[in-house]
Structures are given as structure tokens and as C-alpha cells.
Regions:
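Active-site-adjacent structural elements that line small-molecule/cofactor binding pockets in enzymes
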Residues: 1-332
Length: 332
């Protein structure tokens, strides 16, 4: 199966910018366009619908929505809307969500909550009126969407790092995304974690695609690109660094980076991140350096590499360099 290359966009841009970036990405040959679902940014459906109208080939989806801040029936509706607007190119990305404590949202029973949300979403898309009674969510018998959908079964991606989340993906998902990682050593770890769930469901673990995506900054000035990547990755490091069992972090690095980020000093936080750590959690440098990082993931069997925001010293420059100078270097 051909490896896909995608772009991950942050939803912080003016109207019109998403369409322009999406058209450029499709022309360059990217396969998938993802919009993040990070707290307090624009809802992903806005940029996704704009990009759907501007493209005709690429797959589109949010990575990820969460069933704590958005009810499953609303997730089903937004997925159906995107699939209609894109004529069948949408996928659903679901995860437990991050930073929701800032808005007072507890996240109990995440595995059950995600699995039942998936049940509700796909029952609604299939037109199943039989009802559903779960431990977290339910549908009364007869409850159904009041419009025709494009497809009853858009692909499902789950965002997860840990053994239990990956096992759930192995049972029910088409893809698993390890967000915030550019580390090829995580791929066999995730594959084994998927295997436990896949075997339980009678599935081949190879049927579940592994997606790795991370902050990306590419430029012909490699040092400037890596400096910007350090600043960008600092806010995510405290979230994901301790989830990677293959990386040994310098003493107190995550704590010190987190304290500086909390104080609004992202550049100072980024300067603490050494090269070897940066390369595990971001794609950065010259086109040749970024291509080498992506190729390392392809060589260990990922289904998709996702180059995340901000792409370059500017979005437009980054997307252009990724398409014109990185994609041609990849063997897939």
C-alpha cells in the first residue's frame, strides 16, 4: 500500500487562507489535509468546509474531535456535512482531547466514552433506528438523522499513544494517529499495542494504518527552521514527551520547559530543547533534513506521515517547500 503524505493545519487563519493552502497542497501532490482540534482555536469544521470546496482529490478530516466537548450526534452531523461537501473524502478523527481542564470539562472513562461515541456516530450515519444504550451515551429507538448522508462509513482514525487506546484502535479503527511524534522508534511500539486489540477482534494488525505527525518547520535556512521548531514544539513537549517510552529525557527538561511555557516564554523554553530531543518530536531543518526524517518513518512502515503546522517560517513558504523540495525526495 502506498504511503500517504499529509499536512496538518492549525485553525487560526483568516477566511480564504485555508482554501489557498489546500489548493497549493493538492497541486503539489499531498494526499490528506487535516485540521487540528486544539482547545480555543477555530472549530475544525470551518476550515475543513472551506478546503473541501477548494479541492477535488485530497482526503479531509479533523484530528481530532473529542466526545467531551462535542456530543456524538453533533460529531456525526459535522462528519456527514464534510463528507457531503467533499463528495466522499472525509474521515473522522476522535481522541480524548487535551487541555479541557482549562474549561472545566472532566474526562472520565475515556476508553468507554470514545468507543460509545463511535457506536453512536456510525449508527446515525448508517440510519440504524434501533437505539443504543451505553454506559455513557445513548440513542432512543427511532432517533435518526433527518437528511441523506454521502456515505455510512467514512474511515475512522483514533488519536492515541498508550497501550489501552492503541488496543481500542486495533479493534475498531482504520488508522491510529500518534500526534506530536516524528520518532521512528515509536512505530514498532504502537504496532505491538495495536496488535492486542486487532487480534481480539479477529483483525490483521496491518489493516490499521499508523500515522505519525508533528510540528514541522522547513526552510533553506536550516538553522532558522530548527530555531522556530524549538519554539513551536515547546508547548506540546510537556504533553507528549512522557508518553514515549523510547526517549530518555534529560533530567527536569520537561518540567523546566513546561514552566517557561506557562510563563509565556516559549522561545526560552525552546532553547532548552536539545537536537536529539527535537528530532523525536518535530520535523525541522532544510528540505533534505525533513525528507530524511520522513523517510525514516516510511522505512519502518507508517501508513501516513503528517507534516504539522507551521510548516515553515511562513505557512505558504513551508507548504511550497514541502511540496516542491521534500515530496520529490521521498521513496514510498
Amino acid at each position: 500500500m502506498t504511503v500517504e503524505i499529509g499536512l496538518g493545519l492549525q485553525s487560526d487563519k483568516p477566511a480564504g487562507t485555508y482554501a489557498r493552502l489546500a489548493r497549493a497542497a493538492e497541486e503539489h501532490g499531498f494526499d490528506v489535509l487535516t485540521v487540528f482540534g486544539d482547545l480555543m482555536y477555530q472549530p475544525p469544521i470551518f476550515p475543513l468546509l472551506e478546503m473541501a470546496q477548494a479541492t477535488g482529490r485530497v482526503r479531509l478530516g479533523a484530528a481530532c474531535l473529542n466526545p467531551y466537548s462535542m456530543a456524538p450526534y453533533e460529531i456525526a452531523g459535522q462528519l456527514a456535512a464534510l463528507d457531503l461537501a467533499s463528495h466522499g473524502r472525509a474521515y473522522l478523527g476522535l481522541a480524548r482531547g487535551t487541555w479541557l481542564g482549562a474549561v472545566g470539562l472532566p474526562q472520565p472513562r475515556p476508553l468507554t466514552t470514545i468507543e460509545e461515541a463511535v457506536q453512536v456516530v456510525y449508527r446515525l450515519l448508517r440510519g440504524d433506528r434501533g437505539g443504543f444504550t451505553g454506559k455513557v451515551f445513548s440513542l432512543a429507538p427511532g432517533t435518526a438523522l433527518r437528511y441523506d448522508v454521502q456515505r455510512p462509513d467514512p474511515p475512522l482514525l483514533l488519536g492515541a499513544w498508550g497501550p489501552q487506546g492503541a488496543a481500542l484502535a486495533g479493534r475498531i479503527a482504520d488508522e491510529i494517529k500518534v500526534g506530536g511524534s516524528a520518532n521512528p522508534d515509536m512505530v514498532p511500539v504502537i504496532r505491538e499495542r495495536l496488535r492486542a486489540g486487532a487480534e481480539k477482534a479477529g483483525r490483521d494488525v496491518a489493516d490499521v494504518g499508523i500515522v505519525l505527525g508533528a510540528v514541522t518547520v522547513v526552510d533553506t535556512d536550516g538553522e532558522a527552521a530548527r530555531a522556530k521548531a524549538r519554539t513551536e514544539v515547546a508547548m506540546y513537549l510537556a504533553v507528549v514527551a512522557e508518553l514515549d517510552p523510547t526517549v530518555e529525557m534529560p533530567d527536569d527538561l520537561v518540567k523546566r520547559v513546561g514552566e517557561l511555557v506557562d510563563a509565556g516564554e516559549d522561545e526560552a523554553a525552546g532553547r532548552l530543547i536539545p537536537d536529539d530531543v527535537l528530532d523525536r518530536f518535530a520535523f525541522s531543518g532544510t528540505p533534505e533534513q525533513v525528507a530524511a526524517q520522513a523517510q525514516a518513518l516510511i522505512d519502518v512502515g507508517v501508513r501516513r506521515v503528517e507534516f504539522g503546522t507551521p510548516h515553515g517560517l511562513t505557512d505558504e513558504r513551508g507548504v511550497d517547500l514541502l511540496g516542491s523540495a521534500v515530496l520529490p525526495l521521498l521513496r514510498r
